[in-house]
Amino acid sequence: MNRRRKILLALATSLIPLALTAHAQPKIWRVGFLHVGNHHEPPSYRPLMAGMRELGYEEGRNIQYDFRNAVDDADALEIARILVQSRVDVIVAFDNEAIAAAQKGTRTLPIVMINASNPIAAGYAQSLARPGGNMTGFAGRAELPAKELEFLREIAPKLNRILLLFDAREPASTAWRAEARIGAKKFKFTLIERDVTNADGITRVFDNLKPGAAEALMFASPGLRHRHMELGFTLALAHRLLVVANRKDLVEQGALFAYSYDFAKVGRLAASRYVDRVLKGRPPRELPIEEVTEYELTLNAGALKRVGLTLPQAVRVRADKVIE
């Protein structure tokens, strides 16, 4: 063997361990999480990561998570831009504000939606069956406000005046207000509608609210409700208003009721039905948006007692959980 062939053979042999090492290193997937509202962690977040672990994704070994909590819409847009520039493989966006920011940040990077409200009306997808773009995921019931008013009538038959807060800037707000008006007409409620965009606006509404002008509080904008439910809840209780909440934990704290789904279950399902499939190459446009249909009614009988009302027995037996 001549000198040149010996050198080439030695070089090739020395490269084999490097090739084997490179082959042994698994790809590290990068998942960005976007949430608006620093008052709480989205309840689907940790269950989603638990679902990913069940599928074989181990943080630090083959997957990396980047959770970003935005203060407001403007902050969400900046964070969405940062996530796109950091070249994550998929963005998981919780609730409409985060979803809208992610959509504005990219039209190509896959986006998995959690708790989308009226995704068609909001312009996130062409249809539930065929999203048609770079977004898919789980959506809540489109007719939720009307259903909430139906429950409110059954729970408090003598109730009449509802303070309805909405943010006209939100794309889904139009559909939610329409549903609320349909429900109010059907179940004979008077809606006191107020257009607000932030915490100061909500505070001013309550500062100007005359005693007895309203008996209950509802939100007709998903983003506004997500951002400022706690503030509305606190102010409503101070004014002796019943509160229609969006989470069970608020019912435990004194809200009248929440008609909501199991956010933890949805988070875990999102791992297998969406995030894992996207990472394995399925484009979002081929994955139908799933509308959550399993809702639970959580009631607080004590909230009624505080305003001199009693929970009807017919409603009590229908509720999934009653807090005394």
Regions found by a protein language model. Name each.
Residues 1-324:
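Short hydrophobic alpha-helices and adjacent helix-cap/hinge residues
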